[in-house]
């Protein structure tokens, strides 16, 4: 299948605390993407600083790391055709106020500082983030019985 790729999706502490984990997983499954990695974890400050290294000079960096370290997160790897681009569309805009209804942030968020979910913004970012959060042996390669009903 052309353009079959993987993306990193993380449900942030506010999404976990609000009980939205199942709803978010449901949306990705119903779209037809395949879950190949999942962790429920308390991310270390070091991991978070490395994950957000591109934002280290921004004034909100320390607050972002503190927020992401404030509770458990759900780290996931999803696989499918154009999953990075489509996943970003499903998430909505970084600022929930700019997100359309029907997107995760458009349906469940109000403020940018509590936008419940992270998604890789490119295939290259996805590869980096997946390598940061998962060891290769933690990713499961399998064939879904639904695959022939989703892809031509």
Swiss-Prot record:
Autophosphorylation at His-118 increases serine/threonine protein kinase activity of the enzyme. Interaction with the SET complex inhibits the endonuclease activity. Changing residue 96 to S: Increased motility of carcinoma cells. One of its GO terms (biological process) is positive regulation of DNA binding. The active site is at 118 (pros-phosphohistidine intermediate). Its EC number is 2.7.4.6. It is found in: Cytoplasm; Nucleus. Pfam families: NDK. The modification Phosphoserine is found at residues 120, 122, 125. It comes from Homo sapiens. The gene is NME1. Changing residue 120 to A: Limited increase in motility of carcinoma cells. This is Nucleoside diphosphate kinase A. GO terms for cellular component: cytoplasm; cytosol; early endosome; extracellular exosome; membrane; nucleus; ruffle membrane. It catalyses: a 2'-deoxyribonucleoside 5'-diphosphate + ATP = a 2'-deoxyribonucleoside 5'-triphosphate + ADP; a ribonucleoside 5'-diphosphate + ATP = a ribonucleoside 5'-triphosphate + ADP. Hexamer of two different chains: A and B (A6, A5B, A4B2, A3B3, A2B4, AB5, B6). Interacts with PRUNE1. Component of the SET complex, composed of at least ANP32A, APEX1, HMGB2, NME1, SET and TREX1. Within this complex, interacts directly with SET. Also interacts with TREX1, but only following translocation to the nucleus. Isoform 1 is expressed in heart, brain, placenta, lung, liver, skeletal muscle, pancreas, spleen and thymus. Expressed in lung carcinoma cell lines but not in normal lung tissues. Isoform 2 is ubiquitously expressed and its expression is also related to tumor differentiation. Belongs to the NDK family. Keywords: ATP-binding, Cytoplasm, Differentiation, Endocytosis, Isopeptide bond, Kinase, Magnesium, Metal-binding, Neurogenesis, Nucleotide metabolism, Nucleotide-binding, Nucleus, Phosphoprotein, Transferase, Ubl conjugation. It comes from the Eukaryota. The role of this protein in tumor development and progression is uncertain. This protein is found in reduced amount in some tumor cells of high metastatic potential. However, increased NME1 levels correlate with aggressive tumor features in neuroblastoma. May have distinct if not opposite roles in different tumors. GO terms for molecular function: 3'-5' exonuclease activity; ATP binding; DNA nuclease activity; GTP binding; identical protein binding; magnesium ion binding; nucleoside diphosphate kinase activity; ribosomal small subunit binding. PANTHER family: NUCLEOSIDE DIPHOSPHATE KINASE (PTHR11349). Its cofactor is Mg(2+). ATP binds at residues 12, 60, 88, 94, 105, 115. Changing residue 60 to W: No loss of activity or substrate binding.
